[in-house]
Structures are given as C-alpha cells and as structure tokens.
C-alpha cells in the first residue's frame, strides 16, 4: 500500500517504472524459494530459524524505507527493499504451508482452506484496511500540525499561491505520515522478531 502511494504520489513514477520493479520482486521470490528449498528442505533447518530469517528480511525492508524515504530517491535505490520484502514473504509462505503438512489427513483440507482464505482473502483486505485507516488518521494529524504556521500573519505565505501552498502542505504531510507509519511498523516487526528469538 505505502510503496505504491510513495512511488506514484511523491516520486512521480509512472506505470512503466512501477512495473519494471516487479522484476526485482520476482528475483526476490525466486531466490527466497531456492534458499528455502536448500536450507529448509535439504539441510532441515527449523521453522523458528526460517521464520527469524524471513522476519529479519521484512524488518530490513521496513527500516530501509523508514530511514531512506525522501523526495528524490532514485528508482535503483528501491531495488533492495523490494527484494528483501519478496524474499521474506516467500520464506514465510513456504514455511507456513509446510507446517500444514503435519495436520492429520482428515483435517488437512480444512486447514489448507482456512490458510488460503486468511492469507489470500481476509488477511490482505484486513491489513490494507488497517493501514489505510491509519494513513488517513495520521495524515490529518500531521497536516494540522504542519499547517500551524500557515496563516496570514506569516509574511512569507502571502507571496505563495494558495493552491501551491496547499499542495506542498499535503505532500509534506504525506511524507511525514509515511515515515511515522513505517516507524511504527518497524517497531511492531522488531517486537515480533524479538519474540521469535526469545522462544
């Protein structure tokens, strides 16, 4: 959700640039699948180890965007976080689907159906709804905070057209909001990673 908003609204990339980044995501998926096959299937690493590796990759993705988000980030700089995200997601998906192989046969199809429903249908919609709501609420808060000095008393504001001023305010509020939300997601991800490492 945030990636596309950032790339389209802030960086101004068109559909061709966005689609070209899918090759990076595909390479992350392929490398993550090969890595998981080699170390999880052949070398028999544990679920916990694989989950920690996957969450570390996703944490790297979130931290990269938190620390590097900017108005003039080149397209090439987006390759690493997109690769890390795809790499981590495919490891999580493979590990969770493999965990279902331990379910007894009479309940296997129910378990696969529930997992597919949650991951493909319910999970993405719920995640998008929560992040969309958080984006709206935090964006309004940041727009109010950033516009505190934008009144007729400020002499600099009188020389800037209202439309340009409002557009710059909205763009800056969006940047601050995305940075704030990436920060909160990073904290949540680090907490989950710490829980996995402790247990």
Feature locations, PLM:
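Luminal/periplasmic active-site loops of membrane-embedded glycosylation enzymes
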Residues: 150-164
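Transmembrane-helix exit segments and adjacent C-terminal regions of multi-pass membrane proteins
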Residues: 161-199
């Amino acid at each position: 959700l945030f990636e596309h908003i950032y790339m389209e609204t802030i960086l101004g990339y068109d559909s061709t640039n966005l689609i070209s980044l899918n090759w990076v995501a595909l390479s992350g998926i392929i490398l993550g699948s090969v890595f998981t096959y080699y170390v999880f299937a052949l070398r028999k690493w544990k679920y916990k180890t694989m989950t920690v590796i996957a969450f570390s990759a996703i944490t790297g993705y979130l931290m990269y965007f938190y620390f590097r988000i900017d108005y003039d980030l080149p397209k090439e700089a987006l390759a690493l976080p997109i690769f890390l995200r795809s790499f981590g997601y495919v490891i999580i998906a493979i590990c969770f689907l493999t965990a279902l192989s331990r379910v007894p046969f009479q309940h296997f199809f129910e378990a696969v159906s529930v997992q597919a429903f949650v991951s493909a249908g319910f999970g993405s919609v719920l995640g998008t709804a929560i992040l969309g709501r958080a984006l709206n609420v935090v964006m309004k808060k940041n727009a109010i905070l950033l516009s505190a000095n934008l009144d007729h008393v400020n002499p600099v504001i009188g020389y800037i057209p209202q439309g340009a001023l409002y557009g710059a305010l909205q763009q800056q509020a969006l940047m601050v909001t995305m940075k704030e939300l990436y920060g909160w997601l990073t904290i949540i991800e680090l907490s989950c990673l710490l829980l996995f490492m402790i247990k």
